[in-house]
Curated annotation (Swiss-Prot):
It comes from Mus musculus. The modification Phosphoserine is found at residues 710, 717, 926. Residues 382-431 are annotated as: Interaction with CEP97. This is M-phase phosphoprotein 9. The keyword Phosphoprotein applies. Residues 368-729 are annotated as: Required for its centrosomal localization. Residues 730-963 are annotated as: Interaction with KIF24. The gene is Mphosph9. Interacts with CCP110, CEP97 and KIF24. Disruption phenotype: Knockout mice show decreased body weight when compared with wild-type mice around 1 month after birth. An increased percentage of ciliated cells in the proximal and distal tubules is observed in the kidneys of knockout mice at 1 and 4 months after birth. GO terms for biological process: negative regulation of cilium assembly.
Length: 1114
């Protein structure tokens, strides 16, 4: 800023009035922002040094300004800017003077009105008399140099000022000392100072000390509106400090307002001294810390304000005109000092008021033109710098960079660490109490009104500083350089010899007691007068030089301005031509662009239509694409389903093809089986024919046999009648022969013969069955002879044995031949006994045969048969005989049908067959014939012989039946063919005796027929409810049929085992088998099922006849 250009100009010693006028805006900006508590100034102050020097200086200043204006008007070559600047300066001065007068007359009764006045006056750079906080009255150098004492400092907003007055010939010299007493009463309106209205307004000064610097008395050229606006803007930044700093010192405001204090008034120098001493004691106690209610707690580390350490505070001195009234105070712009009337309590009432008035006129009589300023900062300002500093924006940035010093700074004891010979009011002080703060250390305070608010606005001074600056303070012979960057204070030089009249008259340190000396006060006044005289001379010389330089510049500017204007006009004409051509080109270009724009708009419309059509077409195509996608998806799904269906059909076709192959194979197999069945059927038909032929022949033989039997029965009946007759005759003869002695021997012989005849009926019996006594050895011999007679014919065929007399009848004939001749009656009796024996033997044998057959048929294996003990057989024999006799006797023979044998009766028909290898023929032999066999022989031939011999046994007539009824025990029509085939292989001799023809059936082998035939007859066959006939033929056929059935059972069992073994060797059903294997397996399974059914029926049949073991007989 321009303030930095002023640093080097501080060496100038020829001040002028215009420089101060031009430097007013910069000073105003600096004082507004750097220190809001600017000291109160008065526009109606007068100089108390000399009534002679003040008015001429002011008059000269105003005359210079007026002469400058007239010269500028008369010259005709007036610079417009300079002329306007002068007029503006004059107008600003008038406004500020009016504003200050209006503020002086405005009352301040409350703290709110005081704040408003302070705000308005701060913008103008001064405070009115009615401010509540008048810190400018007392200024104490509370700060020290940072290098010397880095202790903390506290602010004391509650301190007020006590004034001491010294009366002299020139007026009253006031000494204000600081104490910590608070003001008890609010301030009252100040008395407005008198000012002459008809003269030019004097320059309004401001004692400015931003952070311990010297006060600068500046002119204010801004309007009140601008000042108020800037103050409001800046006052909002530190409202707390502002109000606190101005509301805390009510005592000082009372001093300035001129209000009479209700307290004690000082009337003598001794009382004033005692009062100052008592206030110093209060300072040690009350000022050791800040007020509890104080909001300002900022403590700079390098600044200390210790009132207890200072016995005598450095005081600011104010000179008041003796002629002034106590209620008025004025500021002398010419000297930079503030003059006012002390309060009544501080005034010396003993001094006559008329005496004071004799020294100087009243303030109202003093013209404003006599006000002088001693501000070297304003003196060194150049006229051109005033115009640049008028703008309001300089207030914000130049506040902390501008510190103005007045010539009154020599009064401050803090200028130097050593003695200050120019300061005639220097009290004894500590060298460490150098005025200055951490950011803006200052060494001087020219105006006492700056020092009071110095410590209260330390932080504002620091925080508002943005540009470090260097200040060179020149007050006549004193030069002080302040370097803000280093926060140091350097006193360049203090020359006591350059201050004339003070070197020998003022000591180095002026104590408070020395200030009370009138001689010292007069010397101080004299020094001040001389100093002010020099300042006035410097100001006059400075302003004259400035005016001359401005005139020269104005003339040079007027000559060069015309040529410059011509050149500028030519340049502007050329520029206008260029602009015209450019304008034409631009218009043509604009027209072409408009045409192009129109064409482009048409194209855009066409393209828009095309785009719309294309977008609609694209939408339609997208819809079609979506439809095609959906249809394609559906088709794909259909294809997949069809593929799956095709695979299923292929698998089904393969399965059907395999099934068709299997069916064809089955058909071929079934066809083959059908052909086999046809061949078997044909063979069975042929066999059936042969069986019929055989049946016819057997029927014929049966008829012949029946006729023979009937003849024999008639013969038997005749013989029985003869026997009865013979018995009757024998009885008669016995009666008659009892008288004769020979009869007893005959009866014994007959008895022995009967016993011997009967005992052989039981096989191996050595005891008689009738008496139970041992047999006679002769009877044993007879039995042996009978056995030997039977043995030679054992191995002979039945046809040949018939001639050997194997029947009982032949035996009787042989006995008759062997015995000697006996009378006929005896013979008849013997024959009768023999017939009875044979009759009983026949029935008994028949019963035993049937019972033994049933018992032996229960056993299916030889091991079981052989394990049976003879004791059990003997025990069971009587039961069997009784059951068989009852069964045979309960059947009437006439209940049979003649020609229609049933299937149930087929199994009961006796057939001659070969015996199963599992049985011995001996088991089938009735126990009644076991005596006929040797002990070591079990050949079936003898059994056959014995069976053949049974044909000649006489049968009861009740058991006889016709030949037609006998046929029901033969084979049915289905089996006739089988037996006819076997008979053809082993034919029976047709010429054989009819009594031997039934025995020919035993030669027929039916094994092949049983293998080929089905077991239909066996399945439905059940044991007959009637017992077998007593006929020998029926018994023999029955035995042969059961034997064949047993053999068939064995064969079926063997075949079943073979089929099961074959099935087990075949692969499992889960594996893959060929068609032929499957067909074979099915055929085997079918065959196995049929065999199981046949085995079941045959097994039941054998169990019924007790051939197989049953659960009932276990």
């Amino acid at each position: 800023m321009e303030d930095f250009d002023l640093v080097e100009n501080l060496q100038k010693t020829s001040p002028s009035v215009e420089s101060d006028i031009k430097s007013a805006p910069q000073s105003l900006g600096l004082s507004l922002h750097a220190n809001r508590s600017s000291p109160h100034l008065s526009t109606n102050g007068v100089s108390s040094f000399s009534g002679k020097t003040g008015p001429p200086v002011i008059q000269g200043t105003v005359e210079v300004l007026t002469a400058l204006r007239q010269d500028l008007q008369n010259s005709g070559r007036t610079d417009s800017e300079l002329w306007k600047s002068c007029e503006r300066i004059q107008e600003e001065i008038r406004k500020l003077v009016k504003l200050q007068l209006s503020h002086a007359s405005r009352p301040s009764c409350s703290s709110s009105s005081v704040s408003e006045q302070v705000s308005a006056e701060t913008q103008m750079g001064f405070f009115s008399e009615n401010s509540e906080r008048n810190e400018s009255v007392v200024s104490s150098p509370a700060s020290k140099e940072p290098e010397t004492q880095p202790a903390s400092s506290t602010s004391y907003p509650d301190c007020h000022v006590d004034s001491s007055s010294v009366s002299s010939g020139y007026g009253t010299f006031c000494i204000l000392d600081m104490n910590t007493h608070k003001a008890k009463e609010p301030t009252e309106p100040l008395e407005p100072g008198a000012a002459s209205q008809g003269q030019h307004p004097a320059s309004v000064v401001q004692a400015h000390g931003p952070a311990g610097g010297a006060a600068a008395i500046n002119f204010f050229t801004q309007t009140p509106e601008e000042l108020c606006a800037s103050l409001k803007e800046d006052g909002s930044t530190f409202p707390g400090e502002f109000d606190r700093n101005f509301l805390g010192e009510n005592k000082i405001s009372e001093v300035y307002s001129g209000k009479a204090n209700s307290g004690k008034s000082v009337t003598s120098w001794a009382q004033r001294l005692k009062q100052n001493q008592s206030k110093q004691a209060h300072t040690e106690d009350d000022c050791s810390g800040p007020k509890p209610g104080s909001e300002l707690n900022w403590k700079p580390p390098a600044d200390t304000f210790d009132l207890a350490a200072d016995a005598a505070r450095p005081c600011a001195f104010y000179i008041n005109k003796p002629a002034e009234s106590p209620s008025s105070w004025l500021s002398d712009s010419g000297t930079g000092l503030t003059y006012w009337k002390l309060e009544e309590k501080d005034m010396y009432h003993s001094l006559p008021e008329t005496l004071e008035k004799t020294f100087a006129p009243s303030p109202a009589e003093r013209p404003l033109s006599q006000v002088l300023t001693l501000d070297p900062g304003a003196i060194r300002m150049k006229p051109k710098e005033h115009v640049a500093g008028i703008q309001a924006h300089g207030f914000l940035h130049a506040l902390d960079d501008r510190i103005s010093f007045s010539p009154d700074s020599v009064l401050e004891p803090s200028l130097s660490r050593h003695s200050d010979t120019d300061s005639s009011s220097q009290a004894s002080h500590n060298p460490s109490q150098v005025s200055g703060f951490s950011k803006y250390p200052s060494t001087t305070r020219a105006s006492p009104v700056d020092t009071w608010k110095n410590h209260a606005f330390q932080r504002e001074s620091r925080t508002s500083s943005t540009i470090p600056s260097r200040y060179t303070i020149t007050s006549n012979d004193i030069s002080v350089k302040t370097v803000d960057e280093e926060n140091t204070v350097t006193v360049a030089s203090v020359s006591q010899s350059q201050l004339p009249g003070t070197a020998n008259s003022v000591p180095e340190c002026i104590s408070l007691a020395s200030l009370e000396d009138p001689v010292m006060l007069s010397k101080i006044r004299q020094n001040l007068k001389e100093k002010h005289a020099r300042h006035v001379a410097d100001l006059r010389a400075y302003y004259e030089s400035e005016i001359s330089s401005l005139k020269q510049k104005l003339e040079a500017k007027d000559i060069s301005a015309v040529e410059e204007w011509k050149k500028k006009n030519e340049i502007l004409a050329d520029r206008c031509g260029q602009l015209d051509s450019a304008l034409n080109e631009a218009t043509s270009r604009v027209r072409t662009l408009e045409k192009n724009n129109n064409l482009l708009e048409i194209e855009v419309s066409d393209l828009r239509e095309r785009f719309n059509a294309a977008s609609s077409a694209s939408k339609v195509l997208q819809e079609r694409i979506e439809e095609m996608r959906t249809s394609n998806k559906e088709k794909d799904n259909t294809i997949t389903r069809l593929k799956c269906r095709l695979q299923d059909l292929e698998e089904a076709f393969e399965n059907a093809y395999k099934l068709s192959d299997d069916k064809e194979a089955r058909l071929r197999q079934e066809n083959k089986m059908f052909q086999d069945l046809l061949g078997e059927y044909e063979s069975l038909g042929k066999e059936h024919g042969r069986v019929k032929d055989t049946l016819n022949t057997t029927e014929n033989k049966l008829l012949d046999a029946h006729t023979q039997i009937s003849d024999l029965k008639r013969t038997i009946s005749k013989l029985e009648a003869q026997v009865k007759q013979a018995e009757h005759e024998s009885m008669l003869s016995l009666r008659n022969g009892a008288k004769v002695p020979e009869r007893p021997s005959r009866s014994n012989s007959v008895a022995t013969s009967d016993v011997s005849r009967r005992k052989w009926l039981i096989p191996g019996a050595e005891y008689s069955i009738f008496t139970g006594q041992p047999l006679d050895p002769r009877d044993r011999k007879l039995d042996k002879q009978l056995e030997e007679a039977l043995v030679p014919g054992y191995h002979s065929p039945p046809e040949k044995d018939s001639s050997l007399g194997s029947s009982p009848a032949s035996l009787l004939v042989k006995k008759k031949r062997d015995t000697p001749d006996t009378p006929p009656i005896i013979k008849a009796l013997k024959e009768l006994d023999e017939e009875r024996v044979f009759k009983s033997w026949g029935t008994q044998t028949e019963k035993e045969d049937s019972s033994s057959k049933l018992v032996n048929s229960r056993q299916t294996e030889p091991s079981v048969n052989t394990g049976r003990s003879p004791e059990k057989c003997a025990q069971q024999r009587p039961k069997r005989q009784t059951s068989a006799s009852q069964r045979s006797s309960s059947l009437p023979p006439s209940s049979r049908k003649a020609n229609t044998p049933t299937k149930r009766e087929i199994m009961l028909t006796p057939v001659t067959v070969a015996y199963s290898p599992k049985r011995s023929p001996k088991e089938n032999l009735s126990p009644g014939f076991s005596h006929l066999l040797s002990k070591n022989e079990s050949s079936p031939v003898r059994f056959d012989i014995l069976l053949d011999d049974l044909d000649t046994v006489p049968v009861s007539t009740l058991q006889q039946t016709t030949a037609k009824k006998q046929l029901q025990f033969l084979l049915d029509d289905s089996e006739e063919k089988k037996y006819s085939e076997k008979n053809s292989d082993d034919p029976v001799n047709p010429s054989s005796c009819p009594e031997h023809s039934p025995n020919g059936l035993k030669k027929v082998s039916t094994r092949q027929a049983w293998e080929k035939s089905k077991s239909v007859s066996l399945e439905q066959c059940q044991p007959g409810s009637a017992a077998p006939q007593d006929n020998g033929f029926e018994y023999t056929a029955k035995i042969r049929t059961l034997a064949e059935t047993e053999r068939f059972f064995d064969e079926l069992t063997k075949e079943k085992d073979q089929i099961e073994a074959a099935l087990s060797r075949m692969p499992s059903p889960g594996g893959r088998i060929t068609l032929q294997t499957r067909l074979n397996q099915e055929a085997l399974e079918d065959r196995l099922e049929k065999i199981n059914r046949e085995l079941g029926s045959v097994r039941m049949t054998l169990k019924k006849f007790h051939v197989l073991r049953s659960s009932a007989n276990l």
